[in-house]
């Protein structure tokens, strides 16, 4: 499967998906740690892809997403943004609302 097809499949199969370095429980550095912590505090199921284990996705996704950095949060096929946006939305209460609605819809 081509890398771009793999990315599209992951995004379509996971209503809430974060591309990050490491895993939510073992992030590789501060940005994915803060982003995944915010997601875990929302108490909804989400998927993740460790881009360190998938160098092809790490190379291709920034072009596909038109977003150069990681982590990247995707919700229902749309890029929400990276760490700063995730944290801003969380602090404003917007992330919790969005993710709860999406999780309920896909339960």
Swiss-Prot record:
Monothiol glutaredoxin involved in the biogenesis of iron-sulfur clusters. One of its GO terms (cellular component) is cytoplasm. One of its GO terms (molecular function) is 2 iron, 2 sulfur cluster binding. Residues 4-106 form the Glutaredoxin domain. Belongs to the glutaredoxin family. Monothiol subfamily. The gene is grxD. Pfam families: Glutaredoxin. The keyword Cell inner membrane does not apply. InterPro entries: Glutaredoxin (IPR002109), GRX_PICOT-like (IPR033658), Monothiol_GRX (IPR014434), Monothiol_GRX-rel (IPR004480), Thioredoxin-like_sf (IPR036249). It comes from Haemophilus influenzae (strain ATCC 51907 / DSM 11121 / KW20 / Rd). It is found in: Cytoplasm. Homodimer. PROSITE patterns: GLUTAREDOXIN_2 (PS51354). Keywords: 2Fe-2S, Cytoplasm, Iron, Iron-sulfur, Metal-binding, Redox-active center. It comes from the Bacteria. [2Fe-2S] cluster binds at residue 29. This is Glutaredoxin 4. Glutathione binds at residues 21, 58, 70, 83-84. The keyword Iron-sulfur applies.
